[in-house]
Amino acid sequence: MKIRILVLILCALTQGCTYVDDYMLGKDNTPQPKELKEIQPKVKMAQSWTTPVGKAHKTNEYLNIKPAIRGDVIYTADASGLVQAVNRKDGQIKWSTALKNNIVSGPTVAAGYVAVGTNASTLVLLNQSDGKEIWQNKVSAEVLAPPAISHQKVIAKTIDGKVYAIDAVNGKQLWVADHGAPSLVLKASSSPIIVDDLVLVGFSDGKLDALELQTGRLIWQRSIAYGTGASDVERLVDIDSDPIISNNVAYLATYQGYVGALSLSNGQFIWRKPASVYKNMLLSHNNLYFTDSNDVLWSLNSSTGQVNWKQTSLKARGLTAPALVGGNLAVGDKTGYLHILSTQTGELLGRSQLSGGVTVSPSVSGKNMYVLTNNGMLNQLSVS
């Protein structure tokens, strides 16, 4: 079955925001970013260093290429095919590997490996210490979300609804599970999550599968949202936000569907609310934070789903998923601004502008942020 891929920018298509991939051409009705109002800064951001880790690329803003922090090193991937290890203290490059194909997801860094997906429908595994290629493995379609690595296995989900388990040592495919996919999907995707001996995978039809890690056998399946409407676009209910697992509860979100908490003990929803989300959520201190498809930031009580606050002053600015830095929230926007918000109230506490658009959520260690911009620069900023 041919899969059509939809590129979503800034807002729900049902509200007229229509920038799509090459199967659909037409006028771009993307709304103008909401004008920023003057604020009295309550936090300060200072930039320590910046270093090039790739090239400016028109597809950078659509890719799931968030830098990964491990110890004193931050690992980056760029659409041009460049994977690098960068010293967090001074921005110096430790190693650099140029792949033959463009990168569409990653890096995932674990167990001494670095994994990325390419536009040639290949998974590539590198050695974490020196960047040397260990293997490449051809799969059925693009891997648009960073794979998972655990128990010497690399687990990856392809855009056509397959899940692959690959031996990390030799690159051999261990099993493939075929869930399938609708005819139209968003150009976004959630990563597999490994929980004990299960792999939890969200799919483009709004279903969550639990697969046995060793065999790929389907253990159970839950429908998180159901597609409704007359058109393929109206029926989009992709699970593109990574499931968050805490205390035997899965926090889930879908596009044009719901955000909710699902008990892994009995498969029942603890709570569920209508929402449209396709970026990763953040769970911290009994609060669930997320950016919805209209660029409204929300805070919900993770136990009850009750709304703590919402921040609407950044609508249509192309916000990233939120990150936690120094006890506050940080989001980037497509015009290059970083915004700091209070976790308690959603109040805007500060902002800083970088040299390129910020469409990948900041990577954080303590009070330091590492921000990848669409012009291929990695920026280190401290928040105080």
UniProtKB/Swiss-Prot annotation:
PANTHER family documented for this protein: CELL SURFACE PROTEIN, OUTER MEMBRANE PROTEIN ASSEMBLY FACTOR BAMB
Taxon lineage: Bacteria, Pseudomonadati, Pseudomonadota, Gammaproteobacteria, Legionellales
Lipidation feature positions (S-diacylglycerol cysteine): C17
Gene: bamB
Subcellular localization: Cell outer membrane
Subunit field text: Part of the Bam complex.
Domain of life the protein comes from: Bacteria
HAMAP family referenced in this protein's UniProt entry, alphabetically: OM_assembly_BamB
Family annotation (SMART domains): PQQ (SM00564)
InterPro entries in the cross-refs: BamB, PQQ_b-propeller_rpt, PQQ_rpt_dom, Quinoprotein_ADH-like_sf, WD40/YVTN_repeat-like_dom_sf
Record organism: Legionella pneumophila (strain Paris)
Signal peptide: 1-16
Protein name: Outer membrane protein assembly factor BamB
GO CC aspect terms: cell outer membrane
Family: Belongs to the BamB family.
One example of a Gene Ontology biological process annotation: Gram-negative-bacterium-type cell outer membrane assembly
Keywords for the protein's UniProt record, in alphabetical order: Cell outer membrane, Lipoprotein, Membrane, Palmitate, Signal
Keyword Membrane: yes
